[in-house]
Amino acid sequence: MTTINLGVPEVPAKSPLAPRRKSRQINVGGVLVGGGAPISVQSMTTTLTADVNATLQQIAELTAAGCDIVRVACPSQDDADALPIIAKKSPIPVIADIHFQPKYVFAAIEAGCAGVRVNPGNIKKFDDKVKEIAQAAKDHGTPIRIGVNAGSLDPRILQKYGKPTAEALVESALWEASLFEEHDFHDIKISVKHHDPMVMVQAYRLLAAQTDYPLHLGVTEAGPLLQGTIKSAVAFGILLSEGIGDTIRVSLSAPPVEEVKVGIGILESLGLRPRKLDIVSCPSCGRAQVDVYKLAEEVQAGLQGFPFPLRVAVMGCVVNGPGEAREADLGVASGNGKGQIFVRGEVIKTVPESQIVETLLEEAMRLAEEMQASGAFGDDQAVGAPIVTVQ
């Protein structure tokens, strides 16, 4: 065999991600945040918190989707009164989101919430209340998130900078953190959110360089599902690849479950969380001899919740089809109204197009049974869905 030297130097294999930023670690209701702990995914309920049943139902849906920590709004006394039962019955840690009224901070702490988010920009006389808040939080072991938002920046900071710049967000956050530190309270995480992902990225870079508190990433008011997903993926991708970020919330004008799906997907794509279901599909073209869109959707739907990691290739034409299918645990290379079914690189049968999805699902179940019997994966890995590649 002839060896061709292209003159490209060998580069030692290493992660394309920077090492995680070293940060303090806090405990949010049993979920560790910072200090090298896995990056957690958060969301926020859209129900009236006072409607306990509706709120707990939505929290259950978020939990099933993979949410690690949930936040609930608390704008009224009725909402505050609902916090004890919600905090007690929720399957995941509950954080109370407090604006305007400092009395609800104390109510949330007393209710047993796993954490409290405070917005120093709009809580009345917040600076004067820090000593009491710090003492109450310390007494109950309740971490506090200092959540600075571009849309509700402290008026004093806004007057100084003229607009919510990255520097303004960071100054506000660090100032409030310093007030807690004066009272020997350090069980803190910080967020500096902005609707512009590039301003947000700059703010978190500045913040990460000046403090070791764990950081909660978020693009505030990111927009509808598509736009918000793009903004969050760009911002989170940049920061997480630089090792910045300890917990994330994708803010979308969409059902909260979608926020969780996007957040988990971002972490999976960066290799920061084990992959589950991943649809990698071609945009289709004139070479496609099957309905790739329909096939991809049916395979994805059929394999939701698959209990083991599995790579499945669903190929729409003969250009890359056979090669990709052979590289997968399970796959199909389609053409001329039929599909060759591959299992672990070997063709096992050819089926009509109408039977492709059914056959793939049957083979996936058979592989799952083999994996279960062999004990290839522990209980902690026996969740989620397979990796599906569609071409």
Curated annotation (Swiss-Prot):
Substrates-to-products reaction catalysed: (2E)-4-hydroxy-3-methylbut-2-enyl diphosphate + oxidized [flavodoxin] + H2O + 2 H(+) = 2-C-methyl-D-erythritol 2,4-cyclic diphosphate + reduced [flavodoxin]
How the cofactor binds, per note?
A: Binds 1 [4Fe-4S] cluster.
Q: Which UniProt keywords apply?
A: 4Fe-4S, Iron, Iron-sulfur, Isoprene biosynthesis, Metal-binding, Oxidoreductase
Q: What is its EC number?
A: 1.17.7.3
Any one GO biological process: terpenoid biosynthetic process
Query: One of this protein's Pfam families, by short name?
Result: GcpE
Q: In which pathway does it act?
A: Isoprenoid biosynthesis; isopentenyl diphosphate biosynthesis via DXP pathway; isopentenyl diphosphate from 1-deoxy-D-xylulose 5-phosphate: step 5/6
Q: Which GO terms describe its molecular function?
A: 4 iron, 4 sulfur cluster binding; 4-hydroxy-3-methylbut-2-en-1-yl diphosphate synthase activity (ferredoxin); 4-hydroxy-3-methylbut-2-enyl-diphosphate synthase activity (flavodoxin); iron ion binding
Cofactor(s), by name = [4Fe-4S] cluster
Record keyword Iron present: yes
Against HAMAP family, the record matches this protein to: IspG (MF_00159)
What this protein is reported to do is described as: Converts 2C-methyl-D-erythritol 2,4-cyclodiphosphate (ME-2,4cPP) into 1-hydroxy-2-methyl-2-(E)-butenyl 4-diphosphate.
**Family under the similarity heading:** Belongs to the IspG family.
Record's PANTHER family? 4-HYDROXY-3-METHYLBUT-2-EN-1-YL DIPHOSPHATE SYNTHASE, 4-HYDROXY-3-METHYLBUT-2-EN-1-YL DIPHOSPHATE SYNTHASE (FERREDOXIN), CHLOROPLASTIC
Under which name does UniProt file this protein? 4-hydroxy-3-methylbut-2-en-1-yl diphosphate synthase (flavodoxin)
Q: Which organism is it from?
A: Acidothermus cellulolyticus (strain ATCC 43068 / DSM 8971 / 11B)
This protein's gene is called: ispG
